């Protein structure tokens, strides 16, 4: 059980990290991130959602690690909005409607829950083949009143509903990731976002010819010395 002082320390660390990684978050969003951390600790005792037990480690390695991807995600969303405006596209997720993001192998909801809290314009679906993990996402959406967050109990390769962005974190090698999710990627402007540790050169080399890596972006996570990066991919036909 976290003491009030312990929560104050965690909140201060979260606030400090958010100011660096995700400028512009308001107090309500910080509150929701803290509430998510509390739910993660509570449910983890029963459901074993993460190997981490210490809330300080959860904050750094889960919340801040996910927040590190927020600025790149926002840039991609801005690019999609510009593309839709310049081409006059008005398909699903275009125009005034929300963008659809699929978080694959979401587990404890990372980074999907963080994205849903910080990007209300996103409609986030967290898919996991383990029912209790999908149920946890549903509970988070209910308790935090996140109408843009959905837990999906399914195998990702069975999904065919289109998404503009498909992301993963510690899920699978890049060739498997794109192969299992290709049917759910929306044309013509859909992209994959893979959160990785070290630069995955061997995985990139093993990708099929019809998949293009268009950007590898290094990330810095406050309090974490380990290497982090984002690999952005798209079907090569979009190049």
UniProtKB/Swiss-Prot annotation:
EC number(s) stated in the UniProt entry for this protein: 2.1.1.170
Molecular functions per Gene Ontology: rRNA (guanine-N7-)-methyltransferase activity
Compartment list: Cytoplasm
Gene Ontology CC terms, in alphabetical order: cytosol
Reaction(s) catalysed by this chain's protein: guanosine(527) in 16S rRNA + S-adenosyl-L-methionine = N(7)-methylguanosine(527) in 16S rRNA + S-adenosyl-L-homocysteine
UniProt xrefs under InterPro entries: rRNA_ssu_MeTfrase_G (IPR003682), SAM-dependent_MTases_sf (IPR029063)
Keyword set, alphabetical order: Cytoplasm, Methyltransferase, rRNA processing, S-adenosyl-L-methionine, Transferase
Matching SUPFAM superfamilies: S-adenosyl-L-methionine-dependent methyltransferases
Sequence positions that bind S-adenosyl-L-methionine: 105, 110, 156-157, 169
Function as written in the Swiss-Prot or TrEMBL entry: Specifically methylates the N7 position of guanine in position 527 of 16S rRNA.
NCBIfam families per record: rsmG_gidB
Alphabetized PANTHER family for the sequence: S-ADENOSYL-L-METHIONINE-DEPENDENT METHYLTRANSFERASES SUPERFAMILY PROTEIN
Family assignment from sequence similarity: Belongs to the methyltransferase superfamily. RNA methyltransferase RsmG family.
Protein name as it appears in the record: Ribosomal RNA small subunit methyltransferase G
Organism in which the protein naturally occurs: Verminephrobacter eiseniae (strain EF01-2)
